[in-house]
Amino acid sequence: MIVATGVDESSLRYRGWRVVLACFLMAFFMFGFGLYGQGVYLAELQRAHGWPGTLVSAASTFSFLLTSVLVIFTDDLLARIGLRSLILCGLSALGASTVLLALMQTPWQLYLAYALMSVGWTGMGTVVIATLLNSWFDRRRGLALSLAFNGATCGGIVLVPLLLSLTGSIGFRSAMLAATMVMVLLVLPVVVGFIRWPAGLPPASGERPADGDAPAPAHSRKALLANAAFWTMVLPIAIALLAQMGFIIHQVTFLEPLIGRASAGLAVTIMAAMAVVGRLSLGLFVDRLDPRLACAASMTSQAAALFVLVQSTSPTALLVCCAIYGFSIGNMITFPPLIIQREIGASSFAAAMGLGTSISGVVSAFGPGIVGLVRSLTGDYTMAFAMCVVLDLVAAGIVLWRPGRRAKLAAS
């Protein structure tokens, strides 16, 4: 709950927008290096060292699973070492990871680099960003989250092509070192200058109580796991992300035989661009919408786009379907913090975000493998993507189930 001070959150003078800028840059580099850049590392490390793709891919999987474990403890880390220290620790770990990726010579260094990347995710990833912005915004919370998380998509659109271009001109090692230096020069000043809790905020909780109100007691992860509102938010998001990750990873393989490599690449670009548009569009209205209803609508639109996609051969229709699908892919990480704030409460926000992100991360990691397995068993992607359609519709149905207007958690 935001302090009732009458502050105009729409004003550009509001300090919270500086925090949004810092979070945008954090998401830009964290997702750029930590997610979208992994395809670059796979190709370049294989080329430089002759390592098998399975070795690098296994390190990537290890990193995502380790991240899913570490983010569970985000609320404990915020209470123990503080917000700014946690973010600076994440920045240092990510920087060390990218430098090590540039300089490594042996496979054990590869796994160390990816372990450091997991620490980076813990300090600069979704949970910290959502918890921080939740404390600064009330009426414009959805817009703030949408703008900040657009940094994630922009990291894929800008940083990855830049890395590829620099690698072609100055080599992978120099490209990674240069990009790391730019990250530190851009992110470090805004973290030191802008990142802080709002005045009067209990630093361990991330909650801002209303005037005259004491903060609600925080609740344990065990209590969250027994809470129906938590599960009707986490399960549908995890299911939708499983289907989403499965489609995204297999998108080019599916489209290339139908429309060619160049057009398949264009489809990926269109989808990424529409993710930015979708986040911005949602951010303008989501604070006036029911987040569960908006989430269900996004999942249904993805199901509809996939349903048409698997039945089409027209290049135009396929590109339009990818655009429609892309419109909602970025919003799957915007809805959980909005639902948590409304139904579980600010005192348990960081704990709920960490636990929910961990669960959805583990579940969604199986998406590419499941889609690939169904494709191998059936010979094409029709049944695999039809499965994704069903999963999206099931997720939309679950997220509309409301166990109560506000979660009632048992005392820790």
Residue ranges and their predicted role:
Residues 115-150:
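Cytoplasmic helix-loop-helix junction between adjacent transmembrane helices
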Residues 70-82, 279-290:
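Helix-to-loop junctions at the C-terminal end of transmembrane segments
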Residues 18-53, 70-74, 160, 246-252, ...:
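Extracytoplasmic
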Residues 38-42, 225-280, 284:
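Extracytoplasmic gate region of multi-pass secondary transporters
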Residues 343-378:
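A late C-terminal transmembrane helix in Major Facilitator Superfamily
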Residues 271-275, 279-281, 286-339:
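C-terminal transmembrane helical hairpin of 12-TM major facilitator-type secondary transporters
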Residues 92-105, 301-313:
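C-terminal ends and interior cores of transmembrane alpha-helices
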Residues 152-199:
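Helix-loop-helix hairpin linking two adjacent transmembrane segments in secondary transporters
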